[in-house]
Amino acid sequence: MRVATADEVEEFEAVSVRGFENEAATITPGRIHPPAILDEPRMVLWLGQVEGKPIGAAMSYRTDEAVGIFGVTTIASTRRRGYGTALTRAAMLVDSGLPSILAPSPEGEGVYRRLGYEQVGELRIWSRQT
């Protein structure tokens, strides 16, 4: 479902942390995604639910040239059931007239290849220690 309220942003953030960390992980609400993120019309947060319980998340950000898909995750106990694929499809269709791009984790590469994505380059990440 498309996140539309501050409470849903909080659920989105919590399930994102649980998906990327572990199912017992917690976070202070608004630490990563404050409710004001809903004011950004190009950003869409997606919350996957099964029987009303949050199980996964994804984000899409639309520019004039493409839709970027980020942060696709599901909690460990719900993986390998197609939920990550469904969340990615929802994010892809935010503006179906534009191509979509993403930078997959090694675990997600197979999912994205099955959805028709192709590798077009190498992502270089830079870091500066403080």
List PLM regions with ranges.
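A conserved beta-strand-loop-helix scaffold within acyl/acetyltransferase catalytic domains
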Residues: 26-75
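A short beta-loop-alpha structural element at the N-terminal edge
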Residues: 1-13
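Helix-loop element at the rim of GNAT/NAT acetyltransferase active sites that forms part
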Residues: 14-26
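Short beta-strand element of the conserved SAM-dependent methyltransferase core
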Residues: 46-48, 125-128
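Conserved GNAT acetyl-CoA-binding A-motif
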Residues: 94-105
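Conserved active-site alpha-helix within GNAT-family acetyltransferase domains
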Residues: 85, 106-123, 129
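Conserved acetyl-CoA-binding loop-helix of GNAT-fold acetyltransferases
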Residues: 70-94, 114
